[in-house]
Amino acid sequence: MAVGKEIRIKIASVRNTQKITRAMEMVAASKMRRTQDRLQATRPYARKIARIIKHLAQANPEYKNPFMVERPVKRVGVVLVSSDRGLCGGLNSNLFRLLLRRMRAWGEAGVEVRLGVIGQKGASFFGGVGADVAAQVVRLGDTPHLEGIIGVLKVMLDAYGEGEIDELYVAHNEFVNTMTQKPKLECLAPIKAEELSDELKGHWDYLYEPDAKTVLDALITRYIESLVFQGLVENNACEQAARMVAMKSASDNAGKLIKELQLIYNKARQAAITQEIAEIVGGAAAV
């Protein structure tokens, strides 16, 4: 029963792997729920800032913050949000394909692209293809904080403020539901006040201290930071959801493989028993 022994070893190995994938599925489900709660908490902050920015921009039309002025596009900056780890299906590869398509389109139009990368997978991939990576940060963990990405954001915001790039985008995965995550490329700058929150019907006039210009300058930076952080938290939720689905699929496939191996083992065992009976009967007949 040498063949039977090999099959039993394979079955035991697959069962051990199945235990690991089931545990990873449960961990990912728990992390996804926590990340969804964080995502819901970040959205009102960005919406409130957008509302104030629109109010300030409409109340002071003569002042144009550099982040609200459109200019000819010769250079583009993209903040890419990816995961640090794999085992999450095609989450990262789908996002990378979207960004590569846009980078090719920009390249054909003579537009240069500069990247600020968040996440190990994005840093490894775009570093490997020779992209212009101006800044990167990796290993932020499962509960990232804004302080962890400030360095990358400052590099990209300074580049925009100094005219080194003419448009700024953020690329991340959008959380639709547990089964669906969509790659998304969102424009951060220039900000178009008319496209911000439309909750200004019947609003009050406010007095700002120290003055409206200073408040607007500070809020625009905070607004862009909040959008990127929201994208980071959303991408984190997508990662955990994709990992949960991938590990469930792996566990299901392991179960199917165990059944197939068990069937092969039973057939091999049955054939061995039949062979032994035939040999015994043959020996008795010879006597």
Curated annotation (Swiss-Prot):
Gene3D superfamilies: 3.40.1380.10, ATP synthase, gamma subunit, helix hairpin domain. CDD domains: F1-ATPase_gamma (cd12151). It holds the Pfam family ATP-synt. It is a peripheral membrane protein. Signal peptide: none annotated. GO terms for biological process: proton motive force-driven plasma membrane ATP synthesis. One of its GO terms (cellular component) is plasma membrane. Keywords: ATP synthesis, Cell inner membrane, Cell membrane, CF(1), Hydrogen ion transport, Ion transport, Membrane, Transport. It is found in: Cell inner membrane. One of its GO terms (molecular function) is ATP binding. NCBIfam families: ATPsyn_F1gamma, PRK05621.1-1. Belongs to the ATPase gamma chain family. F-type ATPases have 2 components, CF(1) - the catalytic core - and CF(0) - the membrane proton channel. CF(1) has five subunits: alpha(3), beta(3), gamma(1), delta(1), epsilon(1). CF(0) has three main subunits: a, b and c. Produces ATP from ADP in the presence of a proton gradient across the membrane. The gamma chain is believed to be important in regulating ATPase activity and the flow of protons through the CF(0) complex. This is ATP synthase gamma chain. The gene is atpG.
